[in-house]
């Protein structure tokens, strides 16, 4: 699946085309041995609503971004190392089909494909690349995953106090630990979660109490064992109001429809959704 494409001219051209579409805002993607295996538009469930996003599957990373002009210009590039990825198949509902969750320690989110066949293609290709990466790096599969954010539209009231009703003046916030939609009063605290951010992040009141209790227990065990504790400025949870940490960098403009693609690639299409896998 990978070896015969590595270091070929066609693979280099494909990767260069991706770099060109992201332009100066994106990171360089060409590396010796890196292969572009698949690409396509999937629907990503963002904070406010589901939006089309461009995805590129390499043998060692998964790249996605916002669509400015389909197959011409992308932005908000995100790069996920595949050894950190775990997939979870989601059940079908009348309103939501062909969905699965991409889980990592830093961020987890839900995507959907245009058909069950396309979803299975993406899942099988990603899982095979993850297996190869884990074998190559000798790392065990990832077991810690960030909670996905519950979409804003899922609730009109705070999911913690169940009293505050959201409006144009009463905004929604998200707990970085559990992903719940909460009001400002129920998410006044911050806590340092190193796997998510080097800075303390907003958490809801329940998660704050649980995290603080867990931290106190760990500190007591360390003191009982006679081991030096973590420096206070790193170990202590940070309290206070949060205001500027709720932005979702994926909340960008939607893209246009597709143009023409070579007939030699395996292709799925429905509306703005499409996927192609190289072999």
From Swiss-Prot:
PH and FYVE-type zinc finger domains are required for lysosomal location. This is Pleckstrin homology domain-containing family F member 1. It holds the Pfam family FYVE. It comes from the Eukaryota. One of its GO terms (molecular function) is phosphatidylinositol-3-phosphate binding. May induce apoptosis through the lysosomal-mitochondrial pathway. Translocates to the lysosome initiating the permeabilization of lysosomal membrane (LMP) and resulting in the release of CTSD and CTSL to the cytoplasm. Triggers the caspase-independent apoptosis by altering mitochondrial membrane permeabilization (MMP) resulting in the release of PDCD8. Residues 35-131 form the PH domain. It comes from Homo sapiens (Human). The keyword Nucleus applies.
